[in-house]
Swiss-Prot record:
Keywords: DNA-directed RNA polymerase, Nucleotidyltransferase, Transcription, Transferase. GO terms for biological process: DNA-templated transcription; regulation of DNA-templated transcription. This is Probable DNA-directed RNA polymerase subunit delta. Participates in both the initiation and recycling phases of transcription. In the presence of the delta subunit, RNAP displays an increased specificity of transcription, a decreased affinity for nucleic acids, and an increased efficiency of RNA synthesis because of enhanced recycling. GO terms for cellular component: DNA-directed RNA polymerase complex. GO terms for molecular function: DNA-directed RNA polymerase activity. The lineage of its organism: Bacteria, Bacillati, Bacillota, Bacilli, Bacillales. InterPro entries: Asxl_HARE-HTH, RNAP_delta_N_dom_sf, RpoE. Belongs to the RpoE family. RNAP is composed of a core of 2 alpha, a beta and a beta' subunits. The core is associated with a delta subunit and one of several sigma factors. Residues 105-164 have a biased composition (Acidic residues). It comes from the Bacteria. Pfam families: HARE-HTH.
Amino acid sequence: MKLAELSKEEIQELSMVEVAYLVMKETKEPFNYQDLLKKVAELKGMSEEQMLDRIGYLYTDLNIDGRFVTLGDNRWGLRSWYPLEQVEEEITGPTKKKAKAKAEEEVDELDENIEVFDDEFEDLEDELDELAESEDSDEEDEEFDEGDDIDELDDEFEESDDDL
C-alpha cells in the first residue's frame, strides 16, 4: 500500500502510527521525530492544535510498535532496515568523559570523607577505651588496697554470716 494510492478519507481512517510507517517505508530514510510528526499531521490534515494534542500518542505508539526502532538523538527508523548489530551500534553513543570524570571525583571525595570519619571514629573509640580502663582501675583500687588486712575482711564477712 502506498500513500499516493490512498484517498484523503482512507488516510484519515488510518492511525498516526500507520501513516508514519507508510511515510518511512516510501522515503526509505530515518526521520527526526518532530519532522515525522509534522509529516503525519500534514497528511492527515490535522491542525496545529490537534497535532500538539496527539504528540505523545504517536511517540508512545512508535515505542510500542515493533516495526520502529529509535536510532538515538530522537531519530526513528524501520527495524527492517537495520540488522540487530547495527541498531545496537547506532544506539550506543559516545561516552561523555567529563561527566564521568566529575562523578569519579565526587566518589573519590566521598571516599576521603569516609576515611576521615573512620579515623575520627577510631580515635574516639580509643579515647573511650582508655577512659573506661582508667575508671575500672580506679574502682578496683578503692575496693581493695594491698595494705588492707585480709583477715579483717574475713572477720567482717563471718560476723555478717552469723547475723543471718
